[in-house]
Amino acid sequence: MTIPTPRKEFSNKSNNASLSIKKLATHLLKLTGNWPKVISGQLCAPDGDGVMPLPDPPCLFAYIDRFAEVKWRRGGVPKAEFFAGLPHNCERYEWASPHPHFPPLPGVYYTTKPPLPANTGKLDELVARFSPATEYDRLLIKAMVLTFFWGGPKGKRPVFAITTDGGDAKKGRGAGKTTLAEVLAGLVGGVIGLQVRASTDRTRAVLLSPAAWGRRVVLIDNLKSYRFSSDEFEGLVTCEEITGHRLHHGFAARPNYLTYVVTVNGASFSKDMAERSVVVKVKQPTTSPTWYADTRALITEHWDEIVADVRWHLVKKPGMKLNGTDRWPDWCRGVLSKTDKPNAALKLTEQRRRAIDADDGDEEDVVDHVRTRIAAACESVDRVVWVPVLLMAKWVMELRRDFTQHQASQFLRAMVPRVFQYHRHSAGTRYYVWRGKEAEPSTPPITLSYEVNNAAH
């Protein structure tokens, strides 16, 4: 007959004397191997390769029961009071992750030990399974994987916009844009899916959820928007800390070590969004019934070798000298320079940013349209012309029929002073000033008139 081994006790009293919260915490941490820890402001316990929150006293004491028999007595520290005081005696971290950063980031608790750096070639083998449009896109896909693991500063990672040229019969559909993002994000726990039209509160609640802690890639999939612009999304990309309301907790924060990915056919972004983006193009792949399973198997079976290769690139491989940088200098130095042809890739990236910048394209169209209107009204564009703001807004709306007058005015204000000069007359009348290329400085201005059609309005 087997005699059961007596369990250790965890009690708020010793020899009938009450124990302080500090002594109880010291005893608990010794029992559990220095757990729980405070992560993102919340008590957490280990859970496989990750962590799980302990949001209330019942959860905490259920966890303690794994290690000792809980005997809580009257007259000692109440459970609720111990739960409230325990965080002050535990190790604190901003974030926890089962996946490494290279170099490791301060304030992040890593629940697993990473492989040593080694030039295994497995990273190139993985990237080679995809269908980049050019050799430079292959390099940018590799840079995207390195970015997932890069231990760089908060909010200093570009958005990766995965798209196609759209010249094939399917117009870019079925090229594997989403598959590229999701499969490679599997190296670091998978994606956090965001909806463009979701509210700010909803978006931040998703990002701050403990279930999202182990994932570090945010995906906006299959974007369908002309001139995609979002103050919220643009702010998320560059902020150092993501703050908001966490369900059943209250105020919460996480450091912004996330990488943002957008998949889109025919990318058309605002200027701010275009400048934040690195455009990666893919082409229609050669179909294979086993490609997906084989690629997933490569990641599952050779994860250590792939990550060892990533670590070698980020920590051991000397970076190539860059001829310049863009708005992401830390990323260029820490990631892009570790690829084979960083200067050529950087030049291509700048070209593609200009190509997807809908603001520049719209501005050129508006200038051409205004030039036509000036020529019709003044017989020559080589003049100085004062155009009333409402008339100029009307001209913009002739070209952009989706604009309201307010939107047209906002668009014009964004163009000033790069294209038109704004002028307010002493009488209070407001104008945009058109100055033709051949107009002399002393050329007297022509003032156009405009009457508001109240009936039409």
Language model: regions and residue ranges:
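N-terminal nucleic-acid engagement/recognition segments and initiation subdomains in replication
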Residues: 1-128, 136, 153, 206-212, ...
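P-loop NTPase catalytic core of nucleic-acid-dependent motor ATPases
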Residues: 95-214, 392
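Short, well-ordered alpha-helical segments
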Residues: 121, 139, 178, 182, ...
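Structural motif
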Residues: 130-141, 298-305, 403
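Alpha-helix N-cap/helix-initiation sites
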Residues: 134-139, 173-177, 226, 382-386, ...
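Feature primarily recognizes SF3-like P-loop helicase cores of small DNA viruses
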Residues: 144, 153-160, 164, 187-235, ...
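Active/binding-pocket-proximal capping segment
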Residues: 235-236, 412
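Short beta-strand micro-motifs enriched in acidic
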Residues: 423-425
